[in-house]
Amino acid sequence: MEQTRKAAAGVTNPRYANGTLRRRNRARLRAMGGPCGICGGRLGPIHYDEPSDAAHPLSFVVDEIRPVARWRQFGYDSPRAAAEDFNNLQAAHYFCNQRKGAKTQM
């Protein structure tokens, strides 16, 4: 019910406001095949072919270097601008990203 009210009020998750760009950025990071931007690969390589969930802690997720939740603090015009800025994105392990939360560093 709460989700319905938020959607009706026009409040959406900025990460998914432009799904095409989000998928393109995700594919670009996947193609780059880099190490985890959070741990630097200390936990091992990112498993790019596994589902991104708790059962696969080394799986690939897109991490926002500067958290979207703190967009004003980092000088973005909107949460959507922070979520869509490729320079604000990095590949990460699912585990590392969950541990980092809305912080800029671990």
Could you say what each language-model-derived stretch is?
Residues L43-A91:
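Histidine-centered nuclease catalytic patch
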Residues A8, A102-Q105:
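Residue-level detector of intrinsically disordered/flexible regions characterized by low predicted structural confidence
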Residues P45-I46, R99-K103:
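Short, non-ligating residues that shape and space the ligands of small metal-coordination modules
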Residues M1, Q105-M106:
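Short intrinsically disordered terminal tails
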